[in-house]
Amino acid sequence: MSLLIDFIDETEEVKEAYMSLIREVLEKAAQMENIEDGAEVSVTFVDNERIREINRDYRDKDQPTDVISFAMEEMGEGEMEIVGAEMPRMLGDLIISIPRAKEQAEEYGHSFDRELGFLALHGFLHLLGYDHMTEEEEKEMFGRQKEILEAFGLGR
């Protein structure tokens, strides 16, 4: 199983070990979700100010958040699907706020590693079409998150 992950660290404070952890968590999720080899995702680490701008500009929420995902497979209005092109499957982009991840790790009483793994997985599942807008969707998505985190060894 090979998931291509492009990391961009705008904070310049994310250690290679954290990127490796996220790579391994997302590889495990891709395996458990039967994602084909060669699929691509980008992960960008930002500060609270930057994620607040993105949240405001794209989601009309003028506040920082922990993770935002932009799925590439969702068709926008007026976009045409490219059929038959032999291109890798581009799943989308994950944007993670490092300060928010640190705050939440402390708030929830677990490690920064676990919080980063959780946030990356949460955003990744959104890229695959999972959501939590309804109680039923939330139960499915959070159940799957728990399964994958436990299989990886990051359960609570």
Curated annotation (Swiss-Prot):
Enzyme Commission number(s): 3.1.-.-
Record note on cofactor: Binds 1 zinc ion.
Keywords: Cytoplasm, Endonuclease, Hydrolase, Metal-binding, Nuclease, Ribosome biogenesis, rRNA processing, Zinc
Source superkingdom: Bacteria
Pfam family, one: YbeY
Subcellular location: Cytoplasm
InterPro entries, sorted: MetalPrtase_cat_dom_sf_prd, YbeY, YbeY_CS
Entry GO CC: cytoplasm
GO biological process, any: rRNA processing
Top-level class of the enzyme under EC nomenclature: hydrolase
Residues reported to bind Zn(2+): 122, 126, 132
UniProt-recorded Gene Ontology molecular function terms: metalloendopeptidase activity; RNA endonuclease activity; zinc ion binding
Cofactor names: Zn(2+)
Family label: Belongs to the endoribonuclease YbeY family.
Entry function: Single strand-specific metallo-endoribonuclease involved in late-stage 70S ribosome quality control and in maturation of the 3' terminus of the 16S rRNA.
Protein name according to UniProt: Endoribonuclease YbeY
Organism whose genome encodes this protein: Bacillus cereus (strain G9842)
